[in-house]
Design a protein with these regions (language model features):
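Generic detector of well-ordered alpha-helical segments enriched in charged/polar residues
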Residues: 108, 168, 193, 205-208
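Ligand-binding pocket segment of bilobal, Venus flytrap-like solute-binding proteins
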Residues: 199-213
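Intrinsic-disorder/low-complexity, polar/charged segments
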Residues: 125, 186, 209-213
Length: 213
């Protein structure tokens, strides 16, 4: 017998509750400028894709599309080939190359903060190199690019969108949905952000309002 809980009134359910009073705890809020050095993870989070063992070892930070797997392993192949070639300096010291794959923006932050400094840095494009140098990163431009890399937007062949502007307008009109990478760490996302901002803040806001989160 007796009523099931589904038949009980709200007041009857309240009567079953045990209430304890606790001392309110204030949250800690800091208005200090974030410490970039402290916020960055230890470099071990990004292990070496190629580890050189020469008397002189040159470490290069690279974006993932040059140090990944299969078709994205170009720089890894180059480094392994170099390391196997027996290059030596005039005084007989062996020279090797180490490759570490780090997202372009994160790599720039390591350089700006001084938390970890590679000998060479090849981001997805020059934007992050300029970003690092403009924020007091200790860099000198050796070459505009190491290998060609073109940014683009992929759509279905029969979509009718033939330019980036067409695709952006379609997103703004809520006809298609698009995702993009974090512009603070990825050159792809940064390219798109700058493309949108070329036509003003309203253009970016209208686009971003239709981006799923």
């Amino acid at each position: 017998g007796g009523s099931s809980r589904s038949d009980m009134t709200l007041d009857e359910l309240y009567a079953d509750l045990d209430v304890n009073e606790a001392t309110p705890v204030k949250g800690t809020v800091t208005l200090d400028t974030p410490d970039l050095y402290a916020e960055l993870p230890e470099i071990d989070k990004y292990p070496l894709a190629v580890e050189g063992n020469g008397d002189i070892d040159i470490e290069i930070f690279t974006s993932g599309e040059k140090a990944g797997k299969d078709n994205d392993s170009w720089l890894i192949d180059v480094a392994n080939s170099f390391n196997g070639s027996g290059v030596k300096t005039a005084d007989g010291k062996s020279v090797s190359m180490s490759v570490r794959s780090v997202p372009s923006g994160t790599a720039a932050d390591y350089i700006i903060s001084g938390k970890y400094l590679p000998d060479l840095y090849t981001p997805s494009n020059t934007l992050f190199g300029e970003y690092a140098m403009s924020n007091s990163g200790s860099l000198e431009l050796y070459a505009d690019r190491l290998v060609g890399n073109t940014a683009g937007i992929l759509v279905k062949k029969d979509s009718g969108y033939t330019t980036a502007a067409d695709a952006i307008k379609a997103v703004q009109d809520n006809k298609i949905t698009m995702g993009y990478t974090n512009p603070q760490t990825s050159a792809t996302g940064l390219n798109l952000l700058l493309t949108l901002l070329q036509d003003g803040e309203d253009n970016f806001t209208k686009f971003n309002s239709n981006i799923p989160y």
